[in-house]
Amino acid sequence: MTTLTSLQRSEAQRNHIVDLIDKACLRIAPIWPLDSFVAVNPYLGLIDQPFDTVGRYLEQTVGESLFMDHGWFADKIAQGEITDDDLAQAAQQLDPSISLDTIKQQLAVHRQPAPALPLVTNELDRRDAPPVSEFVIEQVSQFMANYYDRGQALWHLPKEASASLFAQWRRYTLINRSASAVGLKQVRQHLLAVPSDAIDALFWALDQINLPESRLPDYLFTLLKTIGGWASWCRYLHFQAGLHGESQHDLRDLLIIRLVWVALVIKETSSAGRQQWRAKLNDWFDPAKLVASPSATATASTKAQSSRIDEILLAAAEQAFRRRINAGLNRQPADAPDQQAERPTVQAAFCIDVRSEVFRRHLEASSPGLETIGFAGFFGLPIDYCRMGESEARLQNPVLINPAYRAQETGDPAIAQHRHARQSRGAIWKQFKLSAASCFTFVESAGLSYVPRLLADSLGWHRSSLPPDAPGLTPEERARLHPQLVKLDGGALSTQEKVDLAEKVLRGLGLTHTFAPIVLLAGHGSSTTNNPHRAGLDCGACAGQAGDVNARVAVQLLNEAAVRLGLIERGIAIPRDTRFVAALHDTTTDHIELLDLDQSGIESDQLSSLTQALKQAGELTRLERLVTLEAQVDTVDAEKQATFRGRDWSQVRPEWGLAGNAAFIAAPRWRTRGLDLGGRAFLHDYDWRHDKEFGVLNVIMTAPLIVANWINLQYYGSTVDNLHQGAGNKVLHNVVGGTVGVIEGNGGDLRVGLAMQSLHDGEQWRHEPLRLSAYIEAPIAEIDKIIAGHDMLNALINNRWMHILHIDDNGIPHRRHAHGDWRPEPI
């Protein structure tokens, strides 16, 4: 194997290397900031490869696991949850050559991690000094936190607007003398020789590292994963730029920074140390020497079989879960409970979020004349939201799409002035508390004034943290502000545009006939305190925001007389007595707040009946949830207990969020009505018989289903390997950059994913890491056509990152196997 130096490389060869860099960067999944924290598939850049192949690759490059330990599966087998039939069927589908005895023998073997790709920084780690490997990560992380600060820091890193991320880091490192503390005495002198241009610095670093080009992809990926949190942040910036047709190279610069650090460490390493590192590196790249099991004679085939057995165990657990669902789906319309032959009294639309499944089930049981609908929580409105008096808008639709319209906050301009004045005073007070001149005397001079608030927070008397739109406003002022639908440039929509949008909303909801007198559109949000990841509990379809804005805008649109008149021409006749009402479902307390009732026109007796049904459903839902959260549930005053959890600033588990999610069902509601799905299924109402051109099906499979998969795999990754794909211990979180993210403790890499407390109750896992099983009641040919026409969906299904199942007219699920082969599922 040969390597080329910078002087020997042609322009084409240089471009090829840069292309390898960019491809390595695309292997990293993005992470959204805390104020819009949405779930992301942490394996997004790897879905072009089969599931088990990625499992081996992650284990061998960075020591990351893609599967639960064997003990977890063994417990399920011992408890009878996973049967021998489940194991045998999974083996038959994935690798018929593997017998049941082989699986059980492997189950008894403790899985040994493969040696991760060796890094030169590890060769300098000594017991009598801080680890060089940790120092490098810490130095990069501190710089990145300063560079990307979003208003948290009072002392800012000086930077030039035109300078690149790499150029800023180089200047920062030249004046930072901390490397000497870990024995790197000559870093500054070596760094002076590094070119200030990022691409030139890249080739300087590669000359020092001196790796054959064939080994670069694995090496580059491994380096990025050592700073995976900040790499994910830069990938987010790259992703956002791509949505707007722009280019962004911070992630490339970050990888070059990491490569330069490797080169600097190589220059500080003794000749013997370099030789030792290169010997280990050569062994790692030699398949005959790479060992992933206790036996030194392990071969590539046995390692592949071990990984395949791990996937067989996972597939068997998923089969066991689906068995419980399959039996419930096997019904005819006449078999479903409480089928309405007449006009329903209320139709209530909720987000497909798994938490809504519990509330919908209890609401339907509380009011037999009521129907519920499942739909993505942004209600099909591609909008952003701009507060009055502000110029920047926030996203209120899925992060995969750009907004087409704007919800503009309107009301008395004086309210916006009051808000600005109060927030300005708050900012001044905060600066006074934290500034270098006053911070040391602040506690002595003003500390006693905080005693009442400390007591209120500690005893749960204080309200939960305010939603993003509430700071600076009184409740009365908030009630006087309303969102108004406008164009992105602020112009008014024509009636035709409103009718087009209203038609899309109604057809997406499946509401084109038989309207109830009251149609409730309920967005959802949460109410927690001292929780940096609060947005992760809000609506993912609304970009990590509460869905009340979308619900209010949709209601205004659908109650407008001119819009209803235009809908008649589209074949949708809304009765004159039908009124749409907006609501907000608080998933922490399971309280439903009805919004803008002064504009609803609902009769008092109708309102009273609806309020009573919502209250009763909330009580039953709270009791069901609190059993999994509290050792003792107050059945008399569960609402107070749930509210206290949201207000308690020491509470690390105010709610379980979407823990337990494992299924997605797109079918008519009668198919699932009355089924107890345990808050584990995303429920999207869909009837293919009313979807003539299957446009709604296409939207469901390429938007809500993808979002559900992202959520599912975020929870999966955070559970199977919280060190690499999770956020660690929530108690130790410190916010970085205002809204950028969190670190664990006082240093280290940016953490991604979910904290352990969101997945584990201290004794057992509350999330069962299973790949999503998506049930769709639609013709197989149409499902196959959509899969074939959507690259991401195709990769997710064909490479086994999720399961897709068709429900036939008899209620029998058929699962899609390799090469598009559909087979009936056991019931």
Swiss-Prot record:
Annotated positions binding Zn(2+): 351, 353, 524, 539
Record note on what altering residue 539 to A does: DAB2 no longer restores CAfree growth
UniProt record similarity statement: Belongs to the inorganic carbon transporter (TC 9.A.2) DabA family.
Membrane-protein topology: Peripheral membrane protein
Coiled-coil residues: none
Descriptive protein name: Probable inorganic carbon transporter subunit DabA2
Cofactor: Zn(2+)
InterPro entries: DabA (IPR018752)
Job description of the protein: Part of an energy-coupled inorganic carbon pump; its substrate may be carbon dioxide. Expression of both dabA2 and dabB2 (DAB2) restores growth in ambient air to E.coli deleted of its carbonic anhydrase genes (called CAfree, deletion of 'can' and 'cynT'); neither dabA2 or dabB2 alone is sufficient. Rescue is pH-independent, suggesting it transports CO(2) and not carbonate ions. Together the genes allow greater than normal uptake of inorganic carbon by E.coli. Uptake of carbon dioxide rather than bicarbonate has been suggested based on kinetic calculations.
Highest taxon listed in the record's lineage: Bacteria
Outcome of gene disruption: Required for growth in ambient air.
Entry keywords, A to Z: Cell inner membrane, Cell membrane, Membrane, Metal-binding, Transport, Zinc
